[in-house]
Amino acid sequence: MDPSTLISRLEAARSSFHNLERQLADPDVASDPTRLQSIARERSRLEPLVNDYASLQAVQSEREQARELLRDSRGDEEMAHLAQLELDELDIRHEALIERLTLALLPRDPRDERSVMLEIRAGAGGDEACLWAGDLARMYERFSSRRGWTVQPVSASEADLGGFKELILSVKGESVFSELKFEAGVHRVQRVPATESQGRVHTSTATVAVMPEADPVEVQIEPADLEISTARSGGAGGQNVNKVETAVDLMHRPSGIRVFCTQERSQLQNRERAMEILRAKLYERQLAEANARESSARRAQVGTGDRSEKIRTYNAKDNRVTDHRLGRNFSLDPVLQGQMEDVIGACIAEEQRSKLEALSRQSDD
């Protein structure tokens, strides 16, 4: 990004920030909780950018003063040396701020701030694939806990020997999609299953879909398009059986999407959850269709959300996780314990690099 464009965008961001502050002081805004929350969130997003811009301006002023001091110190070798040291340090700070501000101004995915529905499906590998799906679920639950997000299972199909055939987690919090979107795809594990008596390594897979929560305005569902039935939910018997039909089986006829929800205590809650899941699935389809219309260069970027893309291999024997999009290895045990910051941070950095390259090509054109 050339300097004039950078400064122009920073000035626009600062103007927007001050405008948002004025709106927050408006009594009409204060009386509208939804609008107030939206404005406050956008102000919080812009605040670090505005602060960094102020730091950049201060560093630029200090650099000019250091240059003047250097020019005035040509007859004083010691003073000139000190002035040059200060200028060198300011140049480093200036470059770091320019890089940080440029990254902050890159095009944002408007969905990044959203909570998500995280769907994990067992793939190839039979019972071991179901166990692997359960391991992935625990990995995401631990990572979400580290990030301060709230995780709740909203739909689950448990396997006989443990784990899940399919599991959907609701992950709510700040900027959840901006980080978890990189998890969409096929996760392959190579390990000796607990059920393997010969000690042979098996390969199993699970597929992860990351669906940003959709607003009812974005995805409108006609009641006439729905088939809804209810059933009892619970365990194999005894006190675990729910004698009231609280489970909801929902079918969306136009898309063929079916959602079965049993996790909530009441039929109404399960119906609301089922509608949330359906809305997220329909929204994901809309996004997939939009992505398919974009250029191959865009689809090649990290984090496109393609659930068929083989993104990672988890090798237990070598205690190694390989992210195939990055061509990088990470230590397996910490990742499975939810310490995913390095992996996701590398994905974010790669996404930023791709955006910078695209921005550079646009500037050249």
Swiss-Prot record:
Residues 291-310 are annotated as: Disordered. Gene3D superfamilies: 3.30.160.20, 3.30.70.1660, 6.10.140.1950. It comes from the Bacteria. GO terms for cellular component: cytoplasm. It is found in: Cytoplasm. The keyword DNA-binding does not apply. One of its GO terms (molecular function) is translation release factor activity, codon specific. Its main location: cytoplasm. The keyword rRNA processing does not apply. Keywords: Cytoplasm, Methylation, Protein biosynthesis. Methylated by PrmC. Methylation increases the termination efficiency of RF1. SMART domains: PCRF. The modification N5-methylglutamine is found at Q239. PROSITE patterns: RF_PROK_I. Belongs to the prokaryotic/mitochondrial release factor family. Peptide chain release factor 1 directs the termination of translation in response to the peptide chain termination codons UAG and UAA. NCBIfam families: prfA, PRK00591.1. This is Peptide chain release factor 1. It comes from Synechococcus sp. (strain WH7803).
